[in-house]
């Protein structure tokens, strides 16, 4: 009985693979045309220059935060890793126009689950850039981050980063 009450908690895997949330061309974080992302002020990560307008979950976990302007979503893995998927640059100023959110905060997600659909042409014509940053916002709490050597990526299929959480 005491073992049930005071037994060890379920072991959480410290390693996590992050898949591409968008289909398109991989962009090194340093090449994202925004210093906040390029200088890693928000954390380590990468960008994607998308060729289609759907964002899927790059990890298994929960939706932590859906931005009211629909241009970004925060995700959290079971091991505590926090990820921001931000569609385009300066897209907050579009105030949700061109975006359709498919999830809510608290939703359970699996790799490949649709999160947001967006009008690629509209965003491309009305935002600073369509390049979309994917950032580990708590990368200071990781032991290691290995970025794969990729170029063309497919949403929910191409592994981009392998992370070990501290």
UniProtKB/Swiss-Prot annotation:
<dbReference type="InterPro" id="IPR011055">
    <property type="entry name" value="Dup_hybrid_motif"/>
</dbReference>
<feature type="active site" description="Tele-phosphohistidine intermediate; for EIIA activity">
    <location>
        <position position="86"/>
    </location>
</feature>
<comment type="subunit">
    <text>Heterodimer with glycerol kinase (glpk).</text>
</comment>
<dbReference type="Pfam" id="PF00358">
    <property type="entry name" value="PTS_EIIA_1"/>
</dbReference>
<protein>
    <recommendedName>
        <fullName>PTS system glucose-specific EIIA component</fullName>
    </recommendedName>
</protein>
<feature type="modified residue" description="Phosphohistidine; by HPr">
    <location>
        <position position="86"/>
    </location>
</feature>
<dbReference type="GO" id="GO:0016301">
    <property type="term" value="F:kinase activity"/>
</dbReference>
<dbReference type="GO" id="GO:0009401">
    <property type="term" value="P:phosphoenolpyruvate-dependent sugar phosphotransferase system"/>
</dbReference>
<feature type="binding site">
    <location>
        <position position="71"/>
    </location>
    <ligand>
        <name>Zn(2+)</name>
    </ligand>
</feature>
<feature type="site" description="Important for phospho-donor activity">
    <location>
        <position position="71"/>
    </location>
</feature>
<comment type="function">
    <text>The phosphoenolpyruvate-dependent sugar phosphotransferase system (sugar PTS), a major carbohydrate active transport system, catalyzes the phosphorylation of incoming sugar substrates concomitantly with their translocation across the cell membrane. The enzyme II complex composed of PtsG and Crr is involved in glucose transport.</text>
</comment>
<keyword id="KW-0597">Phosphoprotein</keyword>
<keyword id="KW-0418">Kinase</keyword>
<keyword id="KW-0598">Phosphotransferase system</keyword>
<keyword id="KW-0813">Transport</keyword>
<keyword id="KW-0479">Metal-binding</keyword>
<dbReference type="InterPro" id="IPR050890">
    <property type="entry name" value="PTS_EIIA_component"/>
</dbReference>
<feature type="binding site">
    <location>
        <position position="86"/>
    </location>
    <ligand>
        <name>Zn(2+)</name>
    </ligand>
</feature>
<keyword id="KW-0862">Zinc</keyword>
<keyword id="KW-0963">Cytoplasm</keyword>
<keyword id="KW-0762">Sugar transport</keyword>
<feature type="domain" description="PTS EIIA type-1">
    <location>
        <begin position="34"/>
        <end position="138"/>
    </location>
</feature>
<keyword id="KW-0808">Transferase</keyword>
<dbReference type="InterPro" id="IPR001127">
    <property type="entry name" value="PTS_EIIA_1_perm"/>
</dbReference>
<dbReference type="GO" id="GO:0005737">
    <property type="term" value="C:cytoplasm"/>
</dbReference>
<dbReference type="GO" id="GO:0046872">
    <property type="term" value="F:metal ion binding"/>
</dbReference>
């Amino acid at each position: 009985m005491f073992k049930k009450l005071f037994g060890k908690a379920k072991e959480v895997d410290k390693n996590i693979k992050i898949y591409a949330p968008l289909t398109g061309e991989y962009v090194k974080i340093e090449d994202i045309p925004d210093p906040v992302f390029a200088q890693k002020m928000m954390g380590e990560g990468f960008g994607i220059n998308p060729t289609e307008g759907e964002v899927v979950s790059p990890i298994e976990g929960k939706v932590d935060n859906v931005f009211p302007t629909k241009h970004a979503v925060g995700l959290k893995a079971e091991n505590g890793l926090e990820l921001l998927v931000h569609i385009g640059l300066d897209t907050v100023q579009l105030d949700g126009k061109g975006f359709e959110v498919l999830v809510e905060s608290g939703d359970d997600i699996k790799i490949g689950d649709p999160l947001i659909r967006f009008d690629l042409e509209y965003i491309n014509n009305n935002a600073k850039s369509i390049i979309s940053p994917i950032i580990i916002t708590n990368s200071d709490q990781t032991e290691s981050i290995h970025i794969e050597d990729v170029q063309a990526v497919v949403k929910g299929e191409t592994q981009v980063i392998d992370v070990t959480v501290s």
